[in-house]
Amino acid sequence: MQAVERRPSLLFDEYQNSVTKPNETKNKEARVLSENDGDVSPSVLKQKEISVDDMDMISLPTEFDRQMVLGSPMFFDLEDEENKIDPLPSVSHHYGNGESDSFVSSYTPSNLKTGEETKDLFINPFELVSQMRKRYIAASKQDGISNIKNDTEKWFLYPKPLPKFWRFEDDKRFQDPSDSDLNDDGDSTGTGAATPHRHGYYYPSYFTDHYYYYTKSGLKGKGNIKVPYTGEYFDLEDYKKQYIYHLSNQENTQNPLSPYSSKEESLEEEFLTDVPTFQEFRDDFAYIIELIQSHKFNEVSRKRLSYLLDKFELFQYLNSKKEILANKNVPYRDFYNSRKVDRDLSLSGCISQRQLSEYIWEKINLEPERIVYQDPETSRKLSLRDIFQFGCSSNDQPIAIGLKLIDDEFLDWYRNIYLIDYHLTPNKVAKLVGKEMRFYLLAKVFLEFDNFIEGEYLAEIFIKYVIHILEKSKYQLAQVSVNFQFYSSGEDWYKKFSQWLLRWKLVSYNIRWNIQIARIFPKLFKENVVSNFQEFLDLIFNPLFTLEKEQLPIDSSVNTDIIGLQFFLSNVCSMDLVIKESDEYYWKEFTDMNCKPKFWTAQGDNPTVAHYMYYIYKSLAKVNFLRSQNLQNTITLRNYCSPLSSRTSQFGVDLYFTDQVESLVCNLLLCNGGLLQVEPLWDTATMIQYLFYLFQIPILAAPLSSVSLLNSQKSTFLKNKNVLLEHDYLKDQETAKINPSRDITVGEQRSYETNPFMKMFKMGLKISLSSKSILYNSSYTLEPLIEEYSVAASIYLLNPTDLCELSRTSVLSSGYEGWYKAHWIGVGVKKAPYFEENVGGIDNWYDTAKDTSIKHNVPMIRRRYRKETLDQEWNFVRDHFGVINSIW
């Protein structure tokens, strides 16, 4: 009797790799017999022994068996299987008769081939959207290859990286000079013989790194900052010298300080023709909208995502012990000493409520008579003591408030009024009285960089509670997001902010920057700051165009402000569009969607999210082109998403969709920096979620911040404004009163357990954690990012592999330089014969060694699972929807 070939056990961890299709069994058996003269049974030749659990398992050619091989459980009806899943989109006026009973797009994607050669050609929608995205990202130079800072040979990295084993507590520059044996002359022997000055754990020579030149002990910054940090040794003049020296060594490249030639102007015009027009963007946008509104595609996506979630659970059951063993086999590396990046830490909320109260209380006791504010209209000067006289009765002591200076009432007012009405327009004069005036002065003095004391308090806060803490931890890093502010007097915000950074030496290895843009065109229009939407864009981008085109000589006479601004921009990673529930929504007149920005007045109506995104994208594409020509880093685009799922978008003419969908589709097409909110993605159509998975677009989750913000939708301050505050109704009632909104849509409240980031992590989306705004998080520790990971680990029972994968993803998706990514997680953009990982559907990152787990402690078994599962999904898509060649 002929023996039956048994299939490997489902209990094996390598089942998926060792599975054999039924029709391949006989061929395999014949090959084995021919190689061994037929004397040995094929089962004896198996390198892997069959377990006892397999004795009752016989390979049967069933439908389920075939689908397990394909990795697609029973998601489709047999009729659909026979027809190869027929929700294939066909563009009716480009693809023959367009006969498809499930989805026929009435919109033609831009630059799609037309003519007889495309007749009866079916399009794979996933591949088509992928090529759309690649076109937009490549045209704006947001991809990793176009960004010179990922080139470790050409990029000017300054300050020089710290040594591999550097530790904050071992750096002698930060130690008390009384504890050192060195005297002022460098004599450590007592014999009078001078020895070389070698301060710190790292001892480079003077000729290789000027950054560690000898300085006497003591703080190099200004003010009363009492904590040490590496940035106090930053020297702008030294940066200028080394920067110019680096440029002189670059052969056959355009110098960033040389005149902007006419040849480059022609290159710019040629480059900008590659940027899709607004009409092309509208066509592509409409195509994706129809795609995600297809019931068939949403059903397929829903089942595939459910399959991915269940597959990860099965993978965990089968491989959790192997992952734990692999974690333990990596010496000297765990979650705590793996790099992790907070990619969206808000400068306006970078410290906790307790820390801010303690800092203000300390200043009140140390310098109560210091002048900290001057009224722009009356020139009246106020001291710290004077600030607390506002809102106090005659029987109260102005400073008898104690450590409850920053209470929930202030936080509500700061978030809902100050950040919206005053922070974004610094020139606006506040006509407030009472407690509201005290709140305004506290925010202006302690939480603004452009004020009477030149932002000294905010600089001290940032150094003491952010930079110092991050540098001491060494393994925690942050991309700090700062709001772009609009000056009615035409002042350059970039220049002001870079001057503030360099004045107080807010430079650190652990800090990079993001620039956030708010949708406040109606507000600026009402205040006569701008007269059309183009002027709004000019306020943001004209200073950057001027900087990149300015004619400057290559010598030490270069303007220090220009060099300082260039240094700041070299540390900018992303430009973000902030989309909030409070953004003005209702229109007075319905302007044509194709109206150009210079003609968009519309009585101050707010342009749609898509208008903001496209024209910011287009301007950023020009900036990136100029910067890449000048050997400077390029900047990626990111965006938030509307928290309301019930607000209809005004960008649709023939199609109806929400603001959430509009924001997500814009991110899908225009952004390579990722999505800054996870909740709206989870609440929308499953087709969009599946596209974000297939393209591996980075997503940021801030569970603690999202819970804290959404739980206080109706703030205490707004409820009790008439009781708590005194308003000056005589001077300016519009300023004093809070205008009621006609918008009755209310975002639903969330709890931490309902945050979707964990499910998305299991599915395989490129997700990472952020602390975002610590001021509203009720943070209880000095390390809010670790606190974010710890809370997630406690609630969801994350294992070390999960935590290390989240931290590794945060580094891979961050805007840090390629040198640091290679050093921290062992990846680079240059092609290598090792493991390859795609980010955003655009950038391929290659491992620099065969096994890089020593750097990040993510086992290869987890990384292979993610890679093979993603490849399997793309194979599924191509198998069921066809494959097309590149269109662009």
Swiss-Prot record:
Name of this chain's protein: Inactive deaminase YJL070C
Keywords for this protein: Phosphoprotein
Source organism: Saccharomyces cerevisiae (strain ATCC 204508 / S288c)
Modified sites of kind Phosphoserine: 9, 41, 178, 180
Domain of life: Eukaryota
A Pfam family hit: AMP_deaminase
InterPro entries cross-referenced by the UniProt entry: AMPD (IPR006329), Metal_Hydrolase (IPR032466)
Keyword Phosphoprotein: yes
Compositional bias ranges of the Basic and acidic residues kind: 23-34
Region ranges (Disordered): 1-42
GO cellular component, one term: mitochondrion
Stated family: Belongs to the metallo-dependent hydrolases superfamily. Adenosine and AMP deaminases family.
Misc remark: Present with 1100 molecules/cell in log phase SD medium.
